[in-house]
Regions:
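Flexible phosphate-sensing "switch/lid" loops adjacent to ATP/NTP-binding sites
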Residues: 1-223
Length: 223
């Protein structure tokens, strides 16, 4: 059904920059263009227990339950929406050889194939900053490259500090072979919105050839 559309992966420069909030906004926008949306959190760290379609208990990332319920994604199965969970001691097990990179990749590929086969467009939500998961070879950048996803990178704040963080995360994307297609700046002081939109927009175009897709003000009700 996807007709060759590339998935979109929402990544961030660090934790707590509003990645899930932006993902909700993007899903809401995509819903106006596509009949059936897919959502996957390829690698999750904060998991909860839910019931699958057959009533069996399964562990999924907490954001997956939110997206499934809020957008009514009844055509998707929980296990496909959250293929890899990283609980405590997971990295130790990976180093000991109990878990392999290829096994994780197979889980992620299978989940994506299942979701994309019944969806018109798929949104992937990353975990933490771009490099999170590197210790087990499943960083956001590696997952984006694995699935051929277009990366939308989110950062907080103003001008210089935001670009510094963006550039550091871009380096990890380049190393993994992932492509950044756009940037969103979240939690910008309201009186600096126009300045950030103008100057950071020009800087991104000059340095990366990438558009600034949006600038979100730091307002209490948005938090």
């Amino acid at each position: 059904m996807m007709a060759g559309r590339r998935p979109i992966l929402v990544a961030a420069t660090r934790q707590h920059v509003g990645k899930t909030t932006v993902s909700l906004s993007l899903m809401n926008g995509l819903k106006k263009r596509f009949d059936k949306l897919g959502f996957i959190k390829p690698v999750g760290q904060q998991h909860i227990e839910v019931q699958d379609d057959e009533g069996n208990p399964v562990r999924v990332d907490k954001d997956v339950e939110l997206m499934k319920d809020y957008f009514g994604l009844d055509h998707l199965n929980f296990p496909d929406m959250s293929p890899v969970i990283i609980p405590r001691s997971y990295t130790k097990r990976f180093i000991d050889g109990e878990i392999t990179a290829e096994h994780q990749y197979e889980q992620i590929r299978k989940a994506y194939d299942n979701v994309s086969s019944v969806s018109d467009q798929v949104l992937l939500e990353g975990t933490g900053h771009v490099g999170v998961g590197s210790g087990v070879n499943t960083s956001n950048a590696q997952v984006a490259a694995l699935l051929g996803a277009d990366v939308v990178l989110i950062a907080n704040g103003g001008l210089g500090s935001a670009f510094d963080e963006l550039d550091m995360n871009r380096a990890m994307c380049k190393e993994a072979g992932a492509t950044i297609r756009g940037v969103i700046i979240n939690k910008v002081q309201p009186d600096k919105l126009d300045m950030v939109r103008d100057y950071l927009g020009r800087l991104l175009e000059q340095r990366w050839g990438v558009p600034l897709l949006g600038v979100v003000p730091d307002l209490p009700f948005l938090s």
